[in-house]
């Protein structure tokens, strides 16, 4: 027999935590003043009128560096818990982590050879 009544508190919490933000958005939408015009569409730069065009294009190099950073950040997230429990897990997990690191090294060498890490 399943004891689903033990999850009643969870469902109540889930419903209440879902209703609070929905009600906050609805109440602010009803009570907020409606103001339309050119000031609503202008960009805001710390109270100073923007000089020139407010839209800038970023070079694709920024995104490539961000992607490489995310890859190595995820590597750290996976390897840190493994390193903390290295003595408990055994040799098979060590080999799996070694394969994981080797795949990342191959990927970084590939990105380096393709010129993704060069700033020009």
Curated annotation (Swiss-Prot):
Major enzyme class: translocase
Claim: Repressor is one of the keywords in the record: no
Highest taxon above the source species: Eukaryota
Reactions that this protein is recorded to catalyse: a plastoquinone + NADH + (n+1) H(+)(in) = a plastoquinol + NAD(+) + n H(+)(out); a plastoquinone + NADPH + (n+1) H(+)(in) = a plastoquinol + NADP(+) + n H(+)(out)
TM region positions: 10-30, 64-84, 88-108
EC numbers for this chain: 7.1.1.-
GO terms for MF: NADH dehydrogenase (ubiquinone) activity; quinone binding
InterPro entries xrefs: NAD(P)H_OxRDtase_bac/plastid, NADH_UbQ/plastoQ_OxRdtase_su3, NDAH_ubi_oxred_su3_sf
One GO BP: photosynthesis, light reaction
The protein's name: NAD(P)H-quinone oxidoreductase subunit 3, chloroplastic
Natural source organism: Pelargonium hortorum (Common geranium)
The encoding gene: ndhC
